[in-house]
């Protein structure tokens, strides 16, 4: 348990930080907007336009997700100050311990809210797609791509995100050539956007009878799911659409009928595919959503590259930039951008990526 002076100092510090968060989050403006949204939803005629009603419902949930924890935090700190003085006046050690525990809870929530301030990008709150592509190197690289796929699926599951494998191309001997995951959840793109880049694996290959050390690469590209409010002009004449039978390492999560869809956007060379549903129509709709999202993100990256073309201090944006090295026989995984290094390689490959992601976000990558 903290000393009394430490409790007072922490309590005062938290109050200052919460006041800063209230201003940053425009809490009073959000509260006013929430009242407007609630009034609109209470109007029975709103359900004549189901789409608008659903949109307002989503906005209400998003506003409440900000306002409710901040109100609870403010009330908790106000009560905590009073309880601290009461515990001291009555020399109640049990109450003092309870106040200390409440301060820990408040500190954890404040740190979480401060961390979320880093999600300032226009699309950070969006769902996202994660594309994984094996590099050159045959079976070893394809096995590495599948390890990365597993890593992100485990990461998503541990954070309560819904992760759907929308496309997978199986490797010739083991692993995968490529895969696409649709990740749905609060700030999915904000969390994962700094994972875009080349991931390098160094290990003694289980596919080499001589047990020699091999270096393999796999590319990860993360892009936000774009809703219909964003205009992305796609000329149908620029599209090449193919159907095929789904196959791959997705097990029961991947459909095995002839309804799989592959769409090639000829001007850009972008290829997207979806094989999750037995309905060809639904797979086509999902593939088009992926294409729109990918075109949007590539345009945003193109603008960013042009803007930063003369600044070598900034990270390169795109597929060619190596971001992390996984040296398994030395039990070392190092992020080459932030310098963060971890020794428990299996834990990371099982989805423990937060240390890398948080450091990258704090560094403004």
Swiss-Prot record:
Q: Name one GO cellular component term.
A: cytoplasm
Where can this protein be found? Cytoplasm
Alphabetical list of Gene3D superfamilies matching this protein: 3.30.160.20, 3.30.70.1660, Release factor (1.20.58.410)
| Residues carrying N5-methylglutamine | 252
Q: Which SMART domains match?
A: PCRF
What are the alphabetically sorted keywords of the record? Cytoplasm, Methylation, Protein biosynthesis
Q: Which GO terms describe its molecular function?
A: translation release factor activity, codon specific
What kind of modification does the protein receive after translation? Methylated by PrmC. Methylation increases the termination efficiency of RF2.
Reply yes or no: does the keyword Cytoplasm apply: yes
Q: Does the keyword Protein biosynthesis apply?
A: yes
Which PROSITE patterns did the record assign? Answer: RF_PROK_I
> What family is this protein classified in?
Belongs to the prokaryotic/mitochondrial release factor family.
The entry's function note states: Peptide chain release factor 2 directs the termination of translation in response to the peptide chain termination codons UGA and UAA.
Name this polypeptide is given = Peptide chain release factor 2
């Amino acid at each position: 348990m903290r000393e009394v002076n430490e409790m007072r100092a922490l309590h005062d510090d938290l109050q200052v930080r919460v006041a800063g968060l209230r201003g940053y989050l425009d809490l009073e403006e959000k509260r006013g907007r929430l009242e407007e949204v609630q009034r609109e939803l209470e109007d029975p005629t709103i359900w004549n336009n189901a789409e608008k009603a659903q949109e307002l419902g989503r906005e209400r949930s998003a506003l409440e997700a900000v306002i409710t924890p901040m109100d609870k935090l403010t009330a908790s700190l106000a009560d905590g100050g009073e309880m601290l003085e009461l515990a001291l006046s009555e020399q109640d050690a049990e109450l003092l311990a309870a106040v200390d525990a409440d301060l820990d809870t408040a500190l954890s929530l404040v740190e979480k809210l401060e961390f979320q301030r880093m999600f300032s990008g226009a699309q950070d709150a969006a769902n996202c797609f994660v594309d994984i592509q094996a590099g050159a190197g045959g079976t070893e690289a394809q096995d590495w791509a599948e390890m990365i796929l597993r890593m992100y699926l485990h990461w998503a599951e541990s954070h309560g995100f819904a992760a759907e494998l929308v496309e997978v191309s199986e490797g010739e001997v083991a692993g995968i050539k490529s895969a696409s995951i649709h990740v749905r959840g609060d700030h999915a793109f904000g969390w994962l956007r700094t994972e875009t880049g080349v991931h390098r694996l160094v290990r003694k290959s289980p596919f080499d009878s001589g047990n020699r050390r091999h270096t393999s690469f796999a590319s990860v590209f993360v892009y936000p799911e774009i809703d219909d409010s964003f205009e992305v002009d796609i000329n149908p004449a620029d599209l090449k659409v193919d159907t095929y039978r789904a196959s791959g390492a997705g097990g029961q999560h991947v459909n095995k009928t002839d309804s799989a869809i592959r769409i090639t956007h000829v001007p850009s060379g972008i290829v997207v595919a979806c094989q999750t549903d037995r309905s060809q129509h639904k797979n086509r709709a999902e593939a088009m959503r992926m294409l729109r999202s990918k075109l949007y993100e590539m345009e945003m990256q193109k603008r960013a590259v042009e803007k930063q073309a003369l600044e070598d201090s900034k990270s390169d944006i795109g597929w060619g930039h190596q971001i992390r090295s996984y040296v398994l026989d030395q039990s070392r995984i190092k992020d080459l951008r932030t310098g963060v290094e971890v020794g428990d390689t299996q834990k990371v490959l099982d989805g423990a990526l937060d240390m890398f992601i948080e450091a990258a976000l704090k560094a403004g990558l």
